[in-house]
């Protein structure tokens, strides 16, 4: 609605209007009506223009405020379609701005250690992918040199155990010791058996040191010396008998031990098979002898029954047959070559024997 800025009733009456009060004039009335209509039209048009200008000013002020926030001026001669597109773009820009603000807030809240840990990952993502270097295939590495040394102990104190030997050598400063091997002593058949004593004694042994130098020094210093220690010790007066084995390794010792063990097992196997065969032959002979004895007994019983019923001649024949049956095996004796039976001059041989004996005694 347009508002009237001018009040007609408060206007000063002109001279023409003053004359109209006196009498009615049709022409003057028509002219006055036309003037009023013109005035009304001009007022309405002016009001409309003022309203449009105020609306345009408001829209321009809003656009200017938006452009100040965004930093992008807009022209006044844009169509409604462009304004809609601009609104959509403004909303998208606002969304991006919000995302950027959120990202900045998130990075601000992170601790410096976390940011450092995440920085290489982000840089790796943004940076270009680097080419992987081709690693050469693992070549066959040469085996490490075996710098160990081995000493041989030809005799050991009685009932000395491997860990006791190792501790004795290490307490004297000869170490580190990597391996110890002692061969158990095999009791002889003539020696008396001791069932009560369960402790083992060892005949000889080998000790491997981590370095050759310590093995040489140990063999040179301790060889042909007493074990020592406390005076009341069990091994105080025993003597060390050791030698450094030059160019000898633990693998060689194991090969030798395995070879001896395999030979021992093979000999034992052969002896076992031989003993089994002998036992089998003996059992077969015993069984055959029992069978023959049973047959002989049955035959004798039959002959006795026949002899009782028959004549005396029959009994004599049965006795002769029984004597023949008893002689089952005959061993043929081999004659000795050049025996006394075939020597012609026994007296000459006796003379020669006497002469030799007289020279000796």
Curated annotation (Swiss-Prot):
GO terms for molecular function: RNA binding. InterPro entries: ABT1/Esf2, ABT1/ESF2_RRM, Nucleotide-bd_a/b_plait_sf, RBD_domain_sf. Residues 84-94 have a biased composition (Acidic residues). Residues 111-129 have a biased composition (Low complexity). Keywords: Nucleus, Ribosome biogenesis, RNA-binding, rRNA processing. It comes from the Eukaryota. Residues 20-34, 55-67 have a biased composition (Basic and acidic residues). One of its GO terms (cellular component) is nucleolus. It is found in: Nucleus, Nucleolus. Belongs to the ESF2/ABP1 family. This is Pre-rRNA-processing protein esf2. It comes from Aspergillus fumigatus (strain ATCC MYA-4609 / CBS 101355 / FGSC A1100 / Af293) (Neosartorya fumigata). The gene is esf2.
């Amino acid at each position: 609605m347009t508002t009237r800025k001018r009040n007609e009733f408060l206007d000063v009456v002109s001279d023409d209007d003053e004359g109209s009060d006196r009498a009615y004039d049709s022409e003057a009335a028509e002219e006055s009506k036309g003037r009023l209509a013109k005035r009304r039209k001009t007022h309405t048009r002016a009001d409309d223009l003022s309203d449009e200008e105020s609306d345009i000013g408001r829209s321009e002020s809003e656009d200017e405020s938006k452009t100040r926030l965004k930093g992008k001026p807009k022209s006044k001669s844009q169509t409604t379609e462009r304004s809609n597109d601009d609104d959509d773009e403004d909303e998208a820009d606002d969304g991006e701005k919000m995302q950027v603000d959120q990202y900045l807030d998130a990075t601000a809240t992170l601790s410096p250690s976390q940011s450092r840990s995440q920085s290489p990952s982000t840089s790796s993502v943004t940076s270009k992918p680097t080419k992987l270097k081709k690693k050469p295939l693992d070549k066959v590495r040469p085996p490490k040199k075996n710098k160990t040394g081995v000493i041989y102990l030809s005799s050991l104190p009685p009932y000395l155990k491997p860990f006791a030997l190792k501790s004795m050598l290490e307490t004297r400063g000869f170490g580190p010791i990597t391996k110890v091997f002692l061969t158990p002593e095999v009791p002889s058949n003539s020696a008396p058996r001791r069932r009560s004593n369960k402790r083992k004694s060892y005949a000889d042994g080998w000790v491997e040191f981590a370095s050759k130098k310590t093995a040489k020094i140990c063999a040179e210093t301790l060889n042909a010396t007493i074990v020592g220690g406390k005076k009341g010790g069990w091994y105080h007066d025993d003597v060390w008998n050791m030698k450094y084995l030059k160019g000898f390794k633990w693998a060689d010792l194991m090969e030798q031990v395995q070879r001896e063990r395999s030979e021992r097992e093979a000999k034992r196997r052969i002896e076992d098979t031989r003993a089994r065969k002998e036992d089998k032959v003996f059992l077969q002979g015993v069984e055959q002898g029992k069978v023959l004895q049973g047959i002989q007994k049955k035959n004798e019983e039959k002959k006795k029954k026949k002899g009782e019923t028959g004549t005396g001649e029959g009994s004599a024949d049965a006795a002769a047959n029984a004597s023949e049956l008893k002689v089952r095996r005959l061993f043929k004796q081999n004659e000795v070559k050049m025996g006394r039976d075939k020597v012609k001059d026994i007296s000459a041989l006796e003379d020669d024997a006497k002469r030799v004996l007289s020279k000796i005694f």
